[in-house]
């Protein structure tokens, strides 16, 4: 038997999908698609940053039909890339040098202003390198003019605040491909979706019967000011309860568990703590069953958008302009002159998040629910 290693479906270590699903044999397969070459994307950022990058994979796939997309990333992000239909292979960062020493690419792109990511693209054998790399002194630099705008925004606060383009638009420009609001594609699998539904049912939540609202109380450790203060969530739950919109779910990571449990105890069964963050795709599946998520600029926001869940997104230290909501929500931005400061701590009072009142969030929720006609059924 002959094996076509130049097929886009070829895996090398296990049977391909056409063989497993339809019994095709390699030497006579009518589904053979010749691999024209490979594209490399290096993405090492935080999980939310990784998820908002996923639409670019589809844009690349359209622009370079017949090319297999390889991704180099860190271990926590691997599940999201493997759950995206446009990724041909996902490589762990620690294994990257072995592959980069042997595999050649048509294009290698690094979208992160990160020294390790920039050093990695320097190892790649590619006809063209895009994004960011290191110069001979070890400093991060744009690899061509298309990356200069994002580079300037990252180094100059005035330029950053003047920006009106989304992250995806900027990255598509760096990659040299059109961006037509391609969606965030994540396929967690029916098993995870069913498990998430069972978890909700065990908590007494039945999203098919009434709107299910999730409150994400967390943010990454780097940006603690991305989320409203606890007292705002407490007041918001009171407002939602008076409107008959409880119980709500309380979402977050391990760091938010004590905070969420304290809030839940104050409201008994009107606020339910959901803790499935061990598996990021389980967390994604759980988000998918909601009708609306209240969240800062963090992972929950981008996961909600991936599953067409309405959002009320609050912004303080990070840029609201960069976030593409796909027509699925409302942005509430703190009312302070230093908005979008990108600082991890702040001594000012009130903070940017303090200026976004629970009543303002509540009003946005009611407005978004009026647009949410979908049953919570991914």
Describe the role of every protein-language-model region.
Residues 1-378:
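Catalytic machinery of carbohydrate-active enzymes
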């Amino acid at each position: 038997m002959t094996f076509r290693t130049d097929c886009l479906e070829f895996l090398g270590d296990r049977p391909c999908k056409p063989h497993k699903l339809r019994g095709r044999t390699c030497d006579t397969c009518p589904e053979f698609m010749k691999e024209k070459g490979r594209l490399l994307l290096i993405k090492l950022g935080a999980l939310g940053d990784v998820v908002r990058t996923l639409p670019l994979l589809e844009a690349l796939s359209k622009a370079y039909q017949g090319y297999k997309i390889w991704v180099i990333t860190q271990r926590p992000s691997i599940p999201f890339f493997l759950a995206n239909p446009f990724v041909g292979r996902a490589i762990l960062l620690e294994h990257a040098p072995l592959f980069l020493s042997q595999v050649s690419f048509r294009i290698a792109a690094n979208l992160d202003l990160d020294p390790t990511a920039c050093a990695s693209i320097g190892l790649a054998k590619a006809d063209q390198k895009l994004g960011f790399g290191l110069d001979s002194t070890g400093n991060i630099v744009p690899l061509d003019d298309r990356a200069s705008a994002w580079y300037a925004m990252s180094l100059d606060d005035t330029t950053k605040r003047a920006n009106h383009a989304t992250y995806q638009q900027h990255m598509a420009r760096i990659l040299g491909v059109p961006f037509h609001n391609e969606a965030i594609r994540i396929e967690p699998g029916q098993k995870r979706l069913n498990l998430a539904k069972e978890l909700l049912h065990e908590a007494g939540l039945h999203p098919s019967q009434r709107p299910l609202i999730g409150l994400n109380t967390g943010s990454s450790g780097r940006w603690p000011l991305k989320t409203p203060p606890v007292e705002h969530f407490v007041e918001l739950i009171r407002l939602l309860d008076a409107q008959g919109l409880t119980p709500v779910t309380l979402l977050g990571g391990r760091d938010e568990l004590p905070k969420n449990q304290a809030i839940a105890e104050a409201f008994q069964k009107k606020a339910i703590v959901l803790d499935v963050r061990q598996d990021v795709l389980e967390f994604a599946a759980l988000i998918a069953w909601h009708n609306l998520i209240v969240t800062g600029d963090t992972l929950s926001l981008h996961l909600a958008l991936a599953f067409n869940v309405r959002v009320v997104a609050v912004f303080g230290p990070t840029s609201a302009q960069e976030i593409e909501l796909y027509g699925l929500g409302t942005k509430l931005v703190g009312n302070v002159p230093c908005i979008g400061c990108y600082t991890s701590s702040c001594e000012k009072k009130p903070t940017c998040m303090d200026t976004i009142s629970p009543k303002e969030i509540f009003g946005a929720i009611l407005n978004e629910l009026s647009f949410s006609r979908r049953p919570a059924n991914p």
